[in-house]
């Protein structure tokens, strides 16, 4: 599979701010866009935690319009390799970011983020910044 996997940071940015350039890019690439089920979980948690009226509905509307990829056992192969390499290099990564990055690698997808710093050390991960 190829295409773009949007991480939690860029997804949250799109949901909350709806910047015209990103909305246009979203529509232009709609067939090739996905999020990891881990991103869906983080977005739903964030909306519940914030308790802001209407945010949960915005998150659900976003998730209805994008393909949500399940995390399967095939993701455990790149996860194990990437985590071990990063820890050996003294560059550990946050758990959810590592799960999402591993998911993108396993699918051969480019990860789209606003936070290049979090993902720049992941071996084998293609990353783009759209903001």
What are these regions (language model features)?
Residues 7, 36, 93-94, 115-116:
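Histidine- and aromatic-rich ligand-binding microenvironments
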Residues 10-11, 75, 100, 117-118:
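Alpha-helix capping/helix-boundary segments
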Residues 1-35, 45-63:
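Short, well-structured N-terminal submotif of metal-dependent ribonuclease cores
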Residues 1-3, 101, 105-131:
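Acidic, PIN/NYN-like endoribonuclease modules and their adjacent C-terminal/linker elements
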Residues 67-112:
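Active-site neighborhoods of divalent-metal-dependent phosphate/nucleic-acid chemistry enzymes
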Residues 7-8, 43, 79, 104, ...:
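Generic structural signal for small/hydrophobic residues in well-ordered secondary structure
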């Amino acid at each position: 599979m190829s295409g773009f996997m949007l991480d939690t940071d860029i997804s949250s940015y799109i949901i909350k701010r709806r910047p015209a350039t990103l909305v246009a890019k979203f529509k232009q690439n709609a067939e090739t866009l996905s999020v990891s089920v881990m991103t869906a979980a983080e977005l739903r948690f964030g909306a519940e935690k914030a308790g802001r009226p209407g945010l949960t509905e915005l998150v659900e509307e976003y998730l209805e319009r994008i393909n949500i990829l399940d995390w399967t056992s095939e993701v455990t192969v790149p996860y194990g390799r990437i985590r071990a390499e990063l820890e050996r290099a003294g560059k550990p990564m946050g758990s959810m970011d590592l799960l999402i990055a591993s998911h993108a690698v396993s699918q051969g997808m480019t990860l789209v983020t606003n936070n290049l710093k979090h993902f720049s050390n992941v071996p084998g991960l293609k990353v783009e910044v759209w903001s």
